[in-house]
C-alpha cells in the first residue's frame, strides 16, 4: 500500500476527497492508453491518479500524479470530466487527457513499490478495468462517446442574440 508521509488529503465542501487523474495516450490518435498496476493489488491495472494537495490546481495534480505513478511526462490536454465515486469511498476525480512525450526508465513508484505500466488498446483497457475499477472504465467510455472539455456535462449551444 502506498503511503506518503507528508500527504494531506483535501476535501471539497460536500465531503468528497479531491482527486486528479490522466488518461495517458501514446499519441494524439488516443487509441492506446497507459495503465499502471495498483499499489494494493499489483496484478490489477488502474488509471494513474491520486489525491490533490492543498492549494493545488486539478491539472497540476494530474500531471504530478502521472509522473509519480507512471513515470511519464506529456502535453496536458482537455478536461474529460469530473467523476464521482460514492460506493466504498467518496471521491470526486478531475480526469484529463494527456499525450505522452517522455517515458522515464525508472520512476518514483517503480523504485519504491515496484509499480508496473503497460500500453493497452482503449477497448482492451475498458475490459481490464471493468471488473475491479468500473469508474476508471467509465473515463474511457466517456472518451469513446466523444468526451469534451465541458466538465462532463452536455452543453447546448446558446441561441444567437435576438432569437427567442
UniProtKB/Swiss-Prot annotation:
GO cellular component: cytoplasm; nucleus
GO BP annotations, alphabetical order: adenosine 5'-(hexahydrogen pentaphosphate) catabolic process; diadenosine hexaphosphate catabolic process; diadenosine pentaphosphate catabolic process; diphosphoinositol polyphosphate metabolic process
Chain residues that bind Mg(2+) 2: 65
Record-annotated active site: 68 (proton acceptor)
Binding site for substrate: 9, 17-19, 38-40, 89-91, 115, 133
Chain intervals for the UniProt region annotation (Disordered): 144-164
Name of this protein: Diphosphoinositol polyphosphate phosphohydrolase 3-beta
Organism: Bos taurus
Gene name tied to this protein: NUDT11
Amino acid at each position: 500500500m502506498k503511503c506518503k508521509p507528508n500527504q494531506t488529503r483535501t476535501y471539497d465542501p460536500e465531503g468528497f476527497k479531491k482527486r486528479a487523474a490522466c488518461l495517458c495516450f501514446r499519441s494524439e490518435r488516443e487509441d492506446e492508453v497507459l495503465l499502471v498496476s495498483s499499489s494494493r493489488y499489483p496484478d490489477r491495472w488502474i488509471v494513474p491518479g491520486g489525491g490533490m494537495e492543498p492549494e493545488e490546481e486539478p491539472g497540476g495534480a494530474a500531471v504530478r500524479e502521472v509522473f509519480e505513478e507512471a513515470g511519464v511526462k506529456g502535453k496536458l490536454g482537455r478536461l474529460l470530466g469530473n467523476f464521482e465515486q460514492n460506493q466504498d469511498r467518496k471521491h470526486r476525480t478531475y480526469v484529463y487527457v494527456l499525450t505522452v512525450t517522455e517515458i522515464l526508465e525508472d520512476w518514483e513508484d517503480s523504485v519504491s513499490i515496484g509499480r508496473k505500466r503497460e500500453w493497452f488498446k482503449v477497448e482492451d483497457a475498458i475490459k481490464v478495468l471493468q471488473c475491479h475499477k468500473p469508474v476508471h472504465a467509465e473515463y474511457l467510455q466517456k472518451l469513446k462517446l466523444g468526451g469534451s472539455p465541458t466538465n462532463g456535462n452536455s452543453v447546448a449551444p446558446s441561441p444567437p442574440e435576438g432569437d427567442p
